[in-house]
């Protein structure tokens, strides 16, 4: 009886410790995602219908926002209502002219006006595993006129690596 009670108590205590640790990691990930959404929303609020219609000015506008490239190691792109990339940073990815409407986050932003985090996919132009975060671009009246999508390249160092590099005890780790 005593050994069973002790074992049950130890299992309960270990379960609580693991739950606490997982909760802390989830909070860290949530904060990182929230910060990235705020960055996208801030830039999206500066995108006007006139700017979206002028590719040269739109590209210049995006290049003047280096913070986005710090938040998204795979770059950021402005998408037209049909899902086609109209501007991007960095421009070396050559995504302008590519249609992304088939990507879940892009469809949610353009069709439903929702900001979402996407599932990992293989990047069309980056040719690497990526996931996107997309926010709608709206007129002052609230009409969706485009989208802004930030991409995290999972084959490069990112905010997820910083979280995953933490240790659990002396020899444990985390798989994200």
Q: Where do the language-model regions lie?
A:
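Contiguous mid-protein beta-loop-alpha structural module that forms a pocket-lining wall or clamp
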Residues: 119, 127, 134
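Short hydrophobic alpha-helical segments used for membrane anchoring or interfacial signaling
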Residues: 75-83, 173-176
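Amphipathic coiled-coil signal-relay and dimerization helices
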Residues: 43, 79-90
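Juxtamembrane extracytoplasmic/periplasmic/luminal helical "stalk" adjacent to the first N-terminal
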Residues: 1-55, 67-74, 114, 129-133
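Short, mixed charged/polar active-site loops
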Residues: 115, 127-129, 145-147
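PAS/PAS-like sensory domains
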Residues: 111-118
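Solvent-exposed, extracytoplasmic
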Residues: 53-72, 91-92, 99-104, 108, ...
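Core beta-strand residues in small-molecule sensory/regulatory alpha/beta domains
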Residues: 79, 138-139
């Amino acid at each position: 009886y005593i050994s069973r009670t002790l074992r049950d108590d130890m299992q309960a205590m270990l379960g609580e410790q693991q739950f606490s640790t997982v909760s802390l990691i989830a909070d860290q990930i949530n904060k990182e995602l929230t910060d990235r959404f705020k960055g996208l929303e801030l830039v999206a609020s500066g995108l006007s219908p006139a700017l979206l219609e002028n590719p040269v000015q739109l590209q210049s506008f995006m290049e003047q926002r280096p913070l986005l490239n710090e938040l998204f190691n795979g770059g950021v792109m402005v998408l037209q209502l049909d899902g086609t990339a109209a501007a991007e940073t960095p421009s070396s990815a050559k995504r302008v002219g590519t249609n992304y409407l088939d990507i879940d986050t892009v469809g949610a932003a353009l069709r439903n006006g929702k900001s979402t985090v996407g599932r990992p996919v293989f990047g069309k132009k980056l040719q690497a595993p990526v996931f996107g975060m997309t926010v709608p671009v709206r007129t002052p009246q609230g009409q969706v006129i485009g989208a802004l999508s930030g991409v995290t390249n999972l084959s490069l160092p990112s905010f997820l690596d910083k979280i995953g590099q933490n240790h659990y005890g002396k020899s444990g780790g985390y798989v994200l």
